[in-house]
Amino acid sequence: MSGFSQERLMQVLLAPQISEKATYVADKNEQVVFKVASTATKPEVKAAVELLFKVEVKSVQIANVKGKVKRFGKMTGRRKDWKKAFVCLKPGQEINFAAGE
């Protein structure tokens, strides 16, 4: 686990990101997209995916997504910024989210 506590790794991955782009990337490049904690680093994301899903990770790319400005009646508000991780799996590895159903 390369020095990360198991408790911290359980808090790094928040949810899989299911969208048109995520599905396209998964089919084309053997990548999986996750919504991760805003304090997460690439090594933490790699260790968390390997621990939770028992797969081998080739690389991790992280993108900071800016929150949108939204209106609530007369008031304007802003959604939180969040972080998205593109996890590239080694050949032959696969994460199937539909298997739990």
Swiss-Prot record:
GO terms for cellular component: ribonucleoprotein complex; ribosome. One of its GO terms (biological process) is translation. Keywords: Ribonucleoprotein, Ribosomal protein, RNA-binding, rRNA-binding. One of its GO terms (molecular function) is structural constituent of ribosome. Coiled coil: none annotated. InterPro entries: Nucleotide-bd_a/b_plait_sf, Ribosomal_uL23-like, Ribosomal_uL23/eL15/eS24_sf. Part of the 50S ribosomal subunit. Contacts protein L29, and trigger factor when it is bound to the ribosome. One of the early assembly proteins it binds 23S rRNA. One of the proteins that surrounds the polypeptide exit tunnel on the outside of the ribosome. Forms the main docking site for trigger factor binding to the ribosome. NCBIfam families: PRK05738.1-3, PRK05738.2-4. Belongs to the universal ribosomal protein uL23 family. This is Large ribosomal subunit protein uL23. The lineage of its organism: Bacteria, Pseudomonadati, Pseudomonadota, Betaproteobacteria, Rhodocyclales.
